[in-house]
């Protein structure tokens, strides 16, 4: 039974951290403030996570697991390459919209002043997303016999830049300008540029 409680406490700590990232933009989150929010001592936090960096890594693991599990599902279920790209971009933007605090980790804002390895891990996450899009576009040529108006690496990079821009706009607006706002219209413009 204690293992269940530990898992729940870990999840509670991560949820509190994500909540504080959402409600306290621009402010550094200390372990003292986090412990107060969770209702435990700082020592109790450290029983579950050896450092604040590990807490952020826990949230990054959540991001990676959520996004890539769903991306794999999209790739396995959807056969049309452009539809796959559309669904992947919408997934990323929808995830950001539903998790505003975690979105500050995605753009690196919440990681300022934290360990370099955290920012490197987020950079790697975006590289993996771009590689996934590039692979989907490459398969369009191979499986569907259809070409694109530009190299798939350029198109994949533009899609990631678009996604990154929408995430940053969401943060700049104080989480009021939703990343998925006008997505379908913007996707239609993307399709015209690339097909």
Curated annotation (Swiss-Prot):
Pfam families from the entry? SlmA-like_C, TetR_N
* UniProt-listed GO biological process terms: cell division; negative regulation of division septum assembly
Q: Which residues form the HTH tetR-type domain?
A: 7-67
Q: Which UniProt keywords apply?
A: Cell cycle, Cell division, Coiled coil, Cytoplasm, DNA-binding
Q: Which GO terms describe its molecular function?
A: sequence-specific DNA binding
UniProt keyword Coiled coil present:
yes
The main place the protein resides is cytoplasm
The domain of life is Bacteria
Q: Quote the SUPFAM superfamilies the UniProt record gives.
A: Homeodomain-like
Query: What Gene3D superfamilies does the record point to?
Result: Tetracycline Repressor, domain 2
Q: Where in the cell is it found?
A: Cytoplasm, Nucleoid
Coiled-coil residues? 109-141
Q: Name one GO cellular component term.
A: cytoplasm
Tell me the PROSITE patterns matching this sequence: HTH_TETR_2
Identify the DNA-binding region of this protein by residue numbers: 30-49
- Briefly state the protein's biological role: Required for nucleoid occlusion (NO) phenomenon, which prevents Z-ring formation and cell division over the nucleoid. Acts as a DNA-associated cell division inhibitor that binds simultaneously chromosomal DNA and FtsZ, and disrupts the assembly of FtsZ polymers. SlmA-DNA-binding sequences (SBS) are dispersed on non-Ter regions of the chromosome, preventing FtsZ polymerization at these regions.
HAMAP family xref list: NO_factor_SlmA
Q: How does it assemble?
A: Homodimer. Interacts with FtsZ.
Q: In which family does this protein belong, per the annotation?
A: Belongs to the nucleoid occlusion factor SlmA family.
Q: Tell me what this protein is called.
A: Nucleoid occlusion factor SlmA
Q: List the source organism.
A: Alteromonas mediterranea (strain DSM 17117 / CIP 110805 / LMG 28347 / Deep ecotype)
Instruction: Give the taxonomic lineage as stored in the record.
Output: Bacteria, Pseudomonadati, Pseudomonadota, Gammaproteobacteria, Alteromonadales
């Amino acid at each position: 039974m204690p293992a269940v409680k530990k898992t729940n406490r870990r999840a509670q700590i991560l949820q509190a951290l994500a909540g504080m990232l959402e409600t306290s933009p621009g402010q550094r989150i200390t372990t003292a403030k986090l412990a107060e929010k969770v209702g435990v001592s700082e020592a109790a936090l450290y029983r579950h996570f050896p450092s604040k960096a590990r807490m952020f890594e826990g949230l990054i693991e959540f991001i990676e697991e959520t996004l890539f599990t769903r991306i794999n599902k999209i790739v396995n279920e959807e056969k049309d390459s452009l539809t796959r790209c559309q669904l992947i971009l919408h997934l990323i933007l929808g995830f950001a919209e539903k998790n505003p605090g975690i979105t500050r980790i995605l753009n690196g804002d919440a990681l300022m002043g934290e360990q370099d390895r955290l920012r490197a891990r987020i950079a790697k996450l975006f590289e993996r997303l771009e590689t996934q899009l590039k692979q989907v576009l490459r398969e369009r040529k191979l499986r569907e016999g259809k070409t694109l108006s530009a190299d798939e690496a350029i198109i994949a990079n533009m899609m990631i830049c678009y996604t990154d821009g929408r995430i940053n706009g969401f943060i700049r607006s104080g989480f009021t300008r939703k990343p998925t706002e006008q997505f379908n219209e913007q996707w239609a413009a993307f399709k015209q540029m690339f097909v």
